Structure formats: structure tokens, C-alpha cells
């Protein structure tokens, strides 16, 4: 099965509940259409959770883009902070350096789109 979700915004409890409800297994694919961070605590944990899931693909949402612009590209953080990024920023800066670098690489390489063929070969 192919599953798609978006806008979890740090709610790892809801994310885990959804995975339990759909009984996601290794043969399934999960596409997350961005916005797993910000507004609530748990966004950084969600990013690492998705990184460890070989059958999950996170696409770059506007919140991940704002974080990437701020912490990866050294850009302006104001827009991100105005959109609920403070919780995520504090979680990020509490990470060990090695974890920051892993997350930095992950954010840098998130796809903006994927092409799926549904019901075809």
C-alpha cells in the first residue's frame, strides 16, 4: 500500500497513532508531504524518525524549507520564527554536533516532488 500524509507539525504522538492505525509494514510506502516540524515540540524527533524509515519519503514542505534556509543556508530566520519555528530551533540547538550535521544533510537533500504511478506498472 501507498500512504500519504502531511502537516504533522511536531505531533509525534499523532504520527505514531497514524502508523499504528494503518499498520504500516516494510512492504508499504509512506510519503510525507512536508511540515513535520514547528508549532509543537517533537519535530526534530520526527525528522530523525523519518530518516530511519527506509520505506518513508519526506518531501520538502514550507516549514522544512524555512528551517533549511535558516540553519543550513545561513539565511534569514525571521520568517521561520514568525511561523512557529522557535520550538524546532531550540530543539535543533540542543542536539549534539553530529546529530546536527546528520539533520543538516537530510534537510539539504529533501526532494520537492516525487512521481508516483498509482494502479499501474
Question: Model-predicted segments: where are they?
Answer:
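N-terminal active-site segment of His-dependent metallophosphoesterases
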Residues: 1-48
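Active-site neighborhood of divalent metal-dependent phosphoester bond hydrolases
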Residues: 40-121
Amino acid at each position: 500500500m501507498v500512504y500519504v500524509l502531511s502537516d504533522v507539525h511536531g505531533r509525534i504522538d499523532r504520527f505514531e497513532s497514524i502508523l499504528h492505525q494503518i499498520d504500516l509494514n516494510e512492504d508499504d510506502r509512506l510519503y510525507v508531504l512536508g511540515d513535520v516540524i514547528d508549532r509543537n515540540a517533537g519535530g526534530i524527533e520526527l525528522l530523525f524518525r523519518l530518516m530511519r524509515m527506509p520505506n518513508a519519503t519526506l518531501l520538502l514542505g514550507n516549514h522544512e524549507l524555512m528551517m533549511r534556509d535558516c540553519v543550513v543556508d545561513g539565511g534569514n530566520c525571521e520568517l521561520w520564527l514568525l511561523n512557529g519555528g522557535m520550538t524546532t530551533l531550540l530543539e535543533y540547538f540542543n542536539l549534539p554536533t553530529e546529530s546536527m550535521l546528520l539533520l543538516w544533510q537530510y534537510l539539504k537533500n529533501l526532494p520537492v516532488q516525487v512521481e508516483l504511478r498509482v494502479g499501474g506498472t
